[in-house]
A protein has these predicted regions:
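Structural signal for interior beta-strand "rungs" in well-ordered beta-sheet cores
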Residues: 1-84, 88-90
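Terminal amphipathic alpha-helical/low-complexity segments used for targeting or macromolecular assembly
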Residues: 86-102
Length: 102
């Protein structure tokens, strides 16, 4: 089914981004240039999606995750992790110092 796309408070969306039907983007997330979020994906709060990334349909990206530049997300992404590559893989878990920078 095609439902509403919901974009939370404080979300920043850069130019040339594609956000499909039934997508939910949590508060204070950031979607940077030329990224695509396919249908029925759920993006948590305070998620950073770098340029030229693609998030496949029906994927869940948990709160605080980082998606690196050009990543292709084909599986659910755990909370507070840094993910890169094509297909995207978890590189590491974010630490307290990362949060101060972000």
């Amino acid at each position: 089914t095609i439902d509403d796309t919901v974009i939370g408070d404080g979300v920043k969306i850069d130019n040339l981004c594609h956000i499909a039907h039934n997508v939910v983007i949590g508060n204070n997330s950031c979607v940077v240039a030329n990224s695509a979020i396919c249908g029925s994906a759920i993006i948590g709060k305070e998620v950073y999606i770098a340029p030229c990334s693609v998030i496949r349909n029906q994927i869940k990206v948990e709160d605080g995750a980082v998606i690196g530049m050009g990543a292709g997300v084909t599986k659910d992404i755990p909370q507070d992790t840094v993910n890169m590559g094509f297909p995207a893989r978890t590189i590491r878990v974010r630490n307290e110092e990362d949060w101060r920078i972000y």
